[in-house]
C-alpha cells in the first residue's frame, strides 16, 4: 500500500470513519448513509478527489434541466463539481483539492464530506426551482 493511501486511511480513521479499500484500490467510506469514494490519483502528487457517485438518475427528457442544475451548483458551490457522468444517465459530484500536510488533508476531507453530505438535497432543491421557471 502506498504512503499516500496509508496517510489518507490514517486521517479518515482519526476522524472517526471506517474506510475500506475496494477491488479497484480506491478508498471508500460511509458518510450520512452515502458511499463516498476517495480517489488518490498519482502517488507523488498531493492531490485527491472525494466523490459521491451517481446520486441522481437522469430521466428521459430532463437532460437539459439536469445540465442547468449541474452548471448552477458548480458555479455557486466552492470546491464542488457537480456533473453528468460518463454514462450520461447519472449525476455525480466531486470535491478535488491539493493538500500540503496531514492537518490540511484532514481539514479538506472534513469540508468535502460536509459538502457532499448536502449536495443531493441542494441538487433536488435547485432542480425544483429551475423546473418552475
Language-model segment annotations:
Residues 1-37, 84-85:
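Charge-rich, low-complexity N-terminal segments
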Residues 3-7, 58-66, 104, 108-115:
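Short amphipathic alpha-helical segments
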Residues 52-90:
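Short, internal acidic amphipathic alpha-helical interface segments
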Residues 88-111, 124-125:
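Well-ordered alpha/beta subsegment
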Residues 115, 119-126:
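Long, charge-dense
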Amino acid at each position: 500500500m502506498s504512503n499516500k493511501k496509508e496517510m489518507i486511511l490514517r486521517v479518515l480513521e482519526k476522524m472517526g470513519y471506517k474506510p475500506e479499500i475496494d477491488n479497484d484500490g480506491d478508498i471508500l467510506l460511509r458518510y450520512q448513509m452515502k458511499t463516498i469514494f476517495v480517489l488518490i490519483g498519482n502517488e507523488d502528487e498531493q492531490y485527491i478527489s472525494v466523490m459521491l457517485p451517481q446520486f441522481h438518475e437522469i430521466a428521459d427528457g430532463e437532460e437539459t434541466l439536469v445540465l442547468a442544475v449541474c452548471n448552477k451548483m458548480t458555479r455557486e458551490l466552492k470546491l464542488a463539481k457537480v456533473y453528468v457522468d460518463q454514462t450520461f444517465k447519472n449525476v455525480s459530484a466531486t470535491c478535488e483539492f491539493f493538500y500540503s500536510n496531514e492537518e490540511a488533508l484532514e481539514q479538506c476531507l472534513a469540508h468535502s464530506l460536509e459538502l457532499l453530505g448536502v449536495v443531493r438535497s441542494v441538487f433536488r432543491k435547485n432542480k425544483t426551482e429551475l423546473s418552475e421557471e
